């Protein structure tokens, strides 16, 4: 009898490992993303990025003890026009607010991050997040992002 719970646990672990740990990976959508990277320390990253079917994860609500709750989603495979770099990342924003808390952007092997993502706004009505001249850094290297990243409409309440 003791083998049954052990077998069930092993089966569950195998299934979760097979599907990436049970997380919500980005799936292609019919939502448009369009942004530009400017003033990059690595000038090969500068340019227009966009996708007509941006891969997005679902929006997750993160309940935090002693701090304002957050909403978070990921995006991936947003190519630069003309080839080269491909963008992916994570957007975190405060619940019941248009305030972006953090943007993490991965480009050409570098991870650029902003806490207090500059001039940015979450628009629940338009299902997107807009950035206007937001500076992100990877230590000393920096990039500036201006444009829009979509988010799914089937979000948890307050997100």
What function would you assign to each model-found segment?
Residues 20-159:
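An extracellular/secretory-lumen and virion-surface interaction module
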Residues 15-18:
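C-terminal motif of bacterial Sec signal peptides marking the signal peptidase cleavage site
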Residues 1-8:
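Bacterial N-terminal signal peptides that target proteins for export
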Residues 11-12, 70:
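Repetitive helical segments and hydrophobic/amphipathic motifs
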């Amino acid at each position: 009898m003791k083998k049954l719970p052990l077998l069930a646990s092993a089966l569950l672990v195998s299934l979760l490992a097979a599907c990436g740990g049970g997380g919500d990976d980005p799936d292609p959508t019919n939502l448009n993303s369009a942004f530009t990277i400017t003033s990059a320390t690595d000038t090969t990253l500068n340019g227009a990025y966009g996708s007509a079917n941006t891969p997005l994860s679902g929006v997750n609500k993160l309940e935090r003890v002693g701090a304002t709750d957050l909403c978070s989603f990921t995006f991936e495979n947003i190519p630069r026009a003309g080839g080269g770099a491909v963008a992916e990342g994570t957007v975190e924003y405060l619940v019941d607010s248009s305030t972006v808390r953090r943007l993490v952007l991965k480009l050409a092997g570098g991870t650029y991050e902003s806490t207090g993502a500059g001039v940015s706004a979450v628009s629940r009505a338009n299902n997107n997040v807009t950035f206007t001249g937001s500076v992100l850094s990877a230590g000393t290297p920096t990039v500036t992002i201006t444009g829009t990243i979509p988010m799914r409409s089937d979000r948890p309440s307050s997100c």
